[in-house]
Every structure is written in structure tokens, then in C-alpha cells.
UniProtKB/Swiss-Prot annotation:
Catalyzes amidations at positions B, D, E, and G on adenosylcobyrinic A,C-diamide. NH(2) groups are provided by glutamine, and one molecule of ATP is hydrogenolyzed for each amidation. HAMAP family: CobQ. PANTHER family: COBYRIC ACID SYNTHASE (PTHR21343:SF1), DETHIOBIOTIN SYNTHETASE (PTHR21343). NCBIfam families: cobQ, PRK00784.1. The lineage of its organism: Bacteria, Pseudomonadati, Pseudomonadota, Betaproteobacteria, Burkholderiales. Keywords: Cobalamin biosynthesis, Glutamine amidotransferase. GO terms for molecular function: ABC-type vitamin B12 transporter activity; catalytic activity. The gene is cobQ. The active site is at 328 (nucleophile), 431. It comes from Burkholderia pseudomallei (strain K96243). This is Cobyric acid synthase. Pathway: Cofactor biosynthesis; adenosylcobalamin biosynthesis. GO terms for biological process: cobalamin biosynthetic process.
Length: 486
């Protein structure tokens, strides 16, 4: 089991790289995260929902993603509550106190999934959540040491040296554990190191002498990886185009407080002719294309957009010929009205006017749509698209008579989304819109980029997984790492 001293220490990446290394040996290996809290999720082949990081790890392991890889997924709906997803299906919206009481039920689901994986694979590489040293969360823990103790699982502790204080993080984390939990820790991995490793040696020797635990490797800071993020938005809000000789498209996406599935934009951030910005505050940069992303709380995020002046900004952008895309929650915001009669996102009966840019209305519903989908753009040469739908809502109205996409359905094609009569606004429920090379190129050309290249994002992701595994093979003591898991 890989645990971390902090969130974003590198647990997900370490598990992905180890899965790829184990796959190279011919072993059948599965990733596993007992409990994940994230708004980036993926749809499995059997119609369930898991954390995006576990889908990436499954790709690294060469197996099909399924709900046992992440039996408990928590999707925050606000500062104090989350939607609880068990074995891929939404069960309830609970606040923190109610979820604490629900943990025994969640733990049963975790142990069921782990048992099935242990029976089906040669090895299971487990990822913890956050830190095992969160004292207030230790009672009834199912994500870190509580799980490790329950199944007698050895632990490797990873820490991020780039943020500073790595030795205090490691020693302090051990100090917060019980004697039996400390004994379970087999060693440390230090992540994101920059500089001369020889200068780190005195610190490593001190750490090993102080704790009696070995350092199993020091991983360098890897720039330019193209891998799906578990949850956090990139630290750098802006990505500049690598090529400016043939023209550049400027894209701006508002960093909504409850933004979900922002992995939709990874292909755009990697495109050599795209200037990409996540807008957080201050003046909004000039843009050719504005994209409203998915949201786990559409009504609250729409109010946030209005408070930030984006309703007027979008209308001005359209007057000057700009293009707008709304994806999932962003699609719902573009319509006339939104209604939440069942209290899916908050108080039952809440309603809000939408941005009024497309003639349809959305009603939020308790039933969640979870489906992988493929088809074509309904314009621009019928470029093929493939992605997935994750939403709780039904959208109806005249604008849907001019769909943005045609997706494969039972007995033929089914329409999805809307394209405005003037061709400036595109709305869709499909996540992963830009991941398919020719669809990405067609959409960038629609938005104004002449001769847009067909960037093969899946190939970039695969190359990053290979690079990750090569780096781990060079910088980890793999004999001791895999011995720790034996």
C-alpha cells in the first residue's frame, strides 16, 4: 500500500508507475483505492463510476477499469457534504458527521472489492488517501492505516520534497501513528527532487538512522507528463502554446469552485497551438473560445459565475464573434432555466434562471446517467468522438433539435447537445470531447484555429506512462520495493 504524508504527495502517480512496471514483468496486477474524494471521475464498462486516477492506473496495468478498483468515491457537493458512491452507484448525499456513521457500511464494500481483486490478480497495489496522520479522521478509518490493519497490508510512505519540509513530514507522520502502524511501514520514497542527489545523502542517512526505515528511492521532478489528474487543478493556471508560427487559439475556462472532470481539458493544455488559461480571479484574458466546464453543484457555480460578471462577459464575447462551449454542467448553465425539485444539489425546489443563450431547460434528477459513448460531430466533416456521460439531469427544449453530436445508440444514432443557429455556441453532455484527435482538430478549427493539428492525446498519455515506469526503474530500489509488498 502506498500512503502519503500529504495530499498530492505523488501516491496516484507512484501506483500508476508501479502498475506499469509490474505489467512489464508479466504479472497480472490491479490498482486499488479503498476511498477516494474527487470530482474527476470515469465511467467503467459496466456502467459504474470510479475516480479518474484509478482509471488511469488500470490503463497502466493493462486491465479494464471496473468499480472494484475504487469501491467508495466521495464527490463533494459543498464545503460540508458529498455524494457517496458505493461500487459505482450513487447512494446518498451525506454531511461529514453522517458519513462518519456510514463508514462501517462503506468498509464492508471496501473489503468485498479487495477480496475479489485478491482472488483475480497476482498482485494488488493499494493507494491511500490524503495522509494517515490526520488525527481527527483516524477513528473508523477505511482509507489508510485502518484498511492496512484490517487486511494486514505493508505500507510504503511517499513524501513530496518540492514543497519543503520532507524530513519533518516523514518523521512527523510516523510519530502520529500507533506502534503497530509504524511497524507496518517498510520504507520511504521521496518524490519530486530537483538538483544533485549527492547533496541529499546526509539527510537520507539521518532519516534512516532516526526512523530505522530505509529510503527506497528518490524520484526526480518530471516535467511535461501528460497524465489525468486525480482532483486538483494544475498549479499553473496558464499553458502557453509551444508553436506560434502558424497561429494560436486562446482558450479560457473559469475555475469553478466545484469544477468536475477538468481532465476534459488536458488535451487542449498539451496542444502546441493553444494558449490555455484557467481563470480564477482578476481580469479575464482575451479569448477566442470560452468553455464552461462540468460542475458538481451547477446552481451554486452558476451563481458564482454571475457574481464574477461572466454572464455579461459571455454575451460580449459572442457579440464580437467568439465561440462558447458548455460541457455537462456547463451545458446546463447555457439554457433558460435550471430546477432542482428533488434537492439533488441542495434545497429541494430550488430554481435559477440560466444564462439564456440556448432555448432549453434542465431539471436535476436523482437518477444519474453513467455511460461510455462514441459517435461523431454533427458538423465539421463528421469527425469521430468518444467519451463518457456523467450527469444528474434531464434537458429539454427546441435548441436540441440542432444537436452538436450524434452518438451511437440502440438501433441507430441519438442526438446529443445543441449547436446554436449562428454556429457560435456548442453544448454537450459528453466528457472527453477533445481526447479524440480528429474531433479535437475539428473543434479547434470551428473555434478559429486554421489548419489545427490532430493531437493524439491518448498516445501522449501512453508515452508518459512508459516514461514514468522507466524513471521508476532507474531511481527506485525495485527489489526492496517489491519485497516490501511480498
Amino acid at each position: 500500500m502506498i500512503q502519503g504524508t500529504t495530499s498530492d504527495a505523488g501516491k496516484s502517480t507512484l501506483v500508476a508507475g508501479l502498475c506499469r512496471l509490474a505489467r512489464r514483468t508479466g504479472a497480472r496486477v490491479a490498482p486499488f483505492k479503498p476511498q477516494n474524494m474527487a470530482l474527476n471521475s470515469a465511467v467503467t464498462a459496466n456502467g459504474g463510476e470510479i475516480g479518474r486516477a484509478q482509471a488511469l492506473q488500470a490503463l497502466a496495468a493493462g486491465i479494464e477499469a471496473h468499480t472494484d478498483l475504487n469501491p467508495v468515491l466521495l464527490k463533494p457537493t459543498g464545503d460540508r457534504g458529498a455524494q457517496v458512491i458505493i461500487h459505482g452507484k450513487a447512494r446518498a448525499n451525506l454531511d461529514a458527521r453522517a458519513y462518519h456513521d456510514y463508514k462501517p457500511t462503506a468498509m464492508r464494500a471496501v473489503l468485498e472489492s479487495y477480496g475479489r481483486l485478491r482472488g483475480a490478480y497476482d498482485a494488488v497495489i493499494v493507494e491511500g488517501a490524503g495522509s494517515p496522520a490526520e488525527i481527527n479522521l483516524r477513528e473508523g478509518d477505511i482509507a489508510n492505516m485502518g484498511f492496512a490493519e484490517a487486511v494486514d497490508c505493508p505500507v510504503v510512505l511517499v513524501a513530496d520534497i518540492d514543497r519543503g519540509g520532507v524530513f519533518a513530514h516523514l518523521v512527523g507522520t510516523l510519530a502520529c501513528l500507533s506502534d503497530s502502524e509504524r511497524a507496518r511501514v517498510r520504507g520511504f520514497v521521496i518524490n519530486r527532487f530537483r538538483g544533485d542527489p549527492a547533496l541529499l545523502e546526509p539527510g537520507l542517512r539521518w532519516l534512516e538512522a532516526r526512523t530505522g526505515k530505509p529510503v527506497l528511492g528518490v524520484l526526480p521532478y518530471l516535467h511535461g507528463l501528460t497524465l489525468d489528474a486525480e482532483d486538483m487543478l494544475p498549479a499553473s493556471a496558464r499553458t502557453s502554446a509551444a508553436r506560434r508560427d502558424a497561429g494560436v487559439l486562446r482558450i479560457v475556462v473559469p475555475a469553478l469552485p466545484r469544477i468536475s472532470n477538468h481532465t476534459d481539458f488536458d488535451a487542449l493544455r498539451a496542444h502546441p497551438r493553444v494558449d490555455f488559461t484557467y481563470w480564477r480571479r482578476g481580469p479575464v484574458p482575451d479569448a477566442d473560445l470560452l468553455i464552461l466546464p462540468g460542475s458538481k453543484n451547477v446552481l451554486a457555480d452558476l451563481a458564482w459565475l454571475r457574481d464574477a460578471g461572466w454572464d455579461a462577459l459571455i454575451k460580449r464575447h459572442l457579440r464580437y464573434g467568439g465561440k462558447v462551449i458548455g460541457i455537462c454542467g456547463g451545458m446546463q448553465m447555457l439554457g433558460r432555466t435550471l430546477a432542482d425539485p428533488h434537492g439533488v444539489e441542495g434545497a429541494a425546489g430550488a430554481t435559477s434562471a440560466g444564462l439564456g443563450l440556448l432555448d432549453y431547460a434542465t431539471t436535476l434528477t436523482p437518477e444519474k446517467t453513467l455511460v461510455n459513448a462514441a459517435g461523431r460531430l454533427a458538423f465539421g466533416g463528421d469527425a469521430r468522438v468518444a467519451g463518457y456521460e456523467i450527469h444528474m439531469g434531464r434537458t429539454e427544449g427546441p435548441a436540441l433539435a440542432s444537436p452538436a453530436l450524434m452518438l451511437a445508440g440502440r438501433g441507430g444514432e441519438r442526438p446529443d447537445g445543441a449547436l446554436s443557429a449562428d454556429g457560435q455556441i456548442l453544448a454537450t453532455y459528453l466528457h472527453g470531447l477533445f481526447d479524440t484527435p480528429h474531433a479535437c482538430a475539428a473543434l479547434l478549427e470551428w473555434a478559429g484555429l486554421d489548419g489545427a493539428e490532430a493531437l493524439d492525446y491518448p498516445a501522449l498519455r501512453e508515452a508518459s506512462l512508459e516514461r514514468l515506469a522507466d524513471t521508476f526503474a532507474e531511481h527506485l530500489d525495485l527489489d526492496r520495493v517489491f519485497a516490501a509488498f511480498a
